[in-house]
């Protein structure tokens, strides 16, 4: 076992040969490499599978022995400073290694078919393998310097993958937005690392925690304030990377990348890096209570904000992105409360559930592209979907499992972890608990809204004119159910919500239905440049994905069904013996310090019943608003009579419109940043440009013009006669000597002698000039 741990440093570098060999192949043998590009998926999956097997072995050793291994190499720069590099294998690293490798393998397997027709297939697999390498290096780092290096590599890979289709302006803008937003957090992270090194003299985690703890125990107020500041800066890095408020604005725009990378970013890599950093540094944060309170506060704000922003999104991937933001808020809330186990448990269950949902959405998008073309604005638009359960039944089943899991319906994965966080929140703060439980209902609502809009009812794409012709340029399809002008300020009615997926015979609220022209599909050009389609087929309806994509969905369904078993407390002899508790024992748990590690199943069932009831309420409301069953009620005019007699109709419409505007416009946070930050920086740049051009350049050009005009003026004093120059020279010398004699008392005869010689030189020069 010692031998295995000693050489576990190679784990991050096992997937690295893939991008290196792809790059060398494109440089040395470009034609052969491109012609056999599908071959490169095999080594990518094989090498990552080797890492997964090694990670599973290390985790088994961790469970059996609770063993922590750290190996360090010291690089001495001088007598006063040295850098130490190494690797750390502990329970947290083992969990993250398995999570990254399992999700990464399934994403690679899925991507082989999903990206098969894209010209950037090789580039995608090179980026993806390097992404996995960076994340593996991050979770096995033994000090803050290594974490920062791999942290930046993860950010670079996300920039490359979000902007993978960089020829699309919106994708190029999205990757720049993600890069700039994360630079804010990364700058704070770097300052925090340097500050802690200045006060402790070490980057190693163990030394860092021990020294800081000793400094705080000495009741040194200066050290406490400085450690609090450094902890805040470190937390800022996690806020940006995990898309927490207020640095969350990059996450929905990151959906412009290919769907497989969206699944990897939102499940196991980039957003998980911030949660991992807080979990790794939790012993430091526990020493500073203000930071723990801040972590929980940011977490609960993000929980509520992400859920409300997901209520009215029309893009299926953006809806899932805001869902990820909200669930990451739950994890951050748990860490802020000190519930270390619950946070990691939810990180695991959410990773597989969200990977299932994203890969399922990729299968939906893949099926819609055969109808609407390769345009994300159309293939990802839930307004154009509906009724897909008849065309993609396997994808529908997988997506339903992921949806129910995220809603917190037992016995699926997220139910167990989210319920544990909700129970701990009641012990921490009743206000936070109320918000967290309410958000659980919002989660169930917007997730079933996505499911019903996508799979229920009838395929709306056949009833709407989406071709971009003049007849549809003024109107767009609203998620609330009818065609309205694109201006968000226009009012929406509640009845429009109820007819979202109704067919034409029963829904009399859609009065203007434009049939799809037969030549529309021929006029739609691919949005993304592709190579060729060997067996191109034309489909009039969506079709199920290929078996390679469905295999990844099937495996993720199994994970979603059974992965929670590692954290379910099976009671034996008065103590819980679940795998996760054994792996994390001893772990930080501030809310259960005096617990005997015994599960009260009566209390558990009571709390679980409450959380499940909230989730079922959210599902019921979503079904009430989006299920086509209400077309029968419309035929009896029941809804119309109720709606007309309602005295609060105007007020309800205003509330509904406000919620819609808030959600669809992303809480106006992006607009605020655009006006205040972007506008302010542009104004400052214009002011700086004006100052540089008018003031700085004006001064320099003024000196030049002054010299020019002075020279032009002086040139008229010279007539070209040497005697005149000598006479003028003598006069200036006389004036100088006269002034000098006045101040230094120079003898008068010396001055006269100099004037006589100067006058003789002038006469001689004049005569010489006349002779010539």
UniProtKB/Swiss-Prot annotation:
GO terms for biological process: ATP synthesis coupled electron transport; electron transport coupled proton transport. Pfam families: Proton_antipo_C, Proton_antipo_M, Proton_antipo_N. GO terms for cellular component: chloroplast thylakoid membrane. Keywords: Chloroplast, Membrane, NAD, NADP, Plastid, Plastoquinone, Quinone, Thylakoid, Translocase, Transmembrane, Transmembrane helix, Transport. It is a multi-pass membrane protein. GO terms for molecular function: NADH dehydrogenase (ubiquinone) activity; quinone binding. It catalyses: a plastoquinone + NADH + (n+1) H(+)(in) = a plastoquinol + NAD(+) + n H(+)(out); a plastoquinone + NADPH + (n+1) H(+)(in) = a plastoquinol + NADP(+) + n H(+)(out). It is found in: Plastid, Chloroplast thylakoid membrane. It is an enzyme of class 7 (translocase). Its EC number is 7.1.1.-. The chain crosses the membrane at residues 9-29, 40-60, 89-109, 125-145, 147-167, 185-205, 220-240, 259-279, 290-312, 328-348, 355-375, 397-417, 426-446, 550-570, 604-624, 731-751. Its main location: plastid. Gene3D superfamilies: 1.20.5.2700. InterPro entries: NADH_UbQ_OxRdtase_chlpt_su5_C, NADHpl_OxRdtase_5_subgr, ND/Mrp_TM, NU5C-like, Proton_antipo_N. Belongs to the complex I subunit 5 family. NDH is composed of at least 16 different subunits, 5 of which are encoded in the nucleus. NDH shuttles electrons from NAD(P)H:plastoquinone, via FMN and iron-sulfur (Fe-S) centers, to quinones in the photosynthetic chain and possibly in a chloroplast respiratory chain. The immediate electron acceptor for the enzyme in this species is believed to be plastoquinone. Couples the redox reaction to proton translocation, and thus conserves the redox energy in a proton gradient. This is NAD(P)H-quinone oxidoreductase subunit 5, chloroplastic. It comes from Oenothera argillicola.
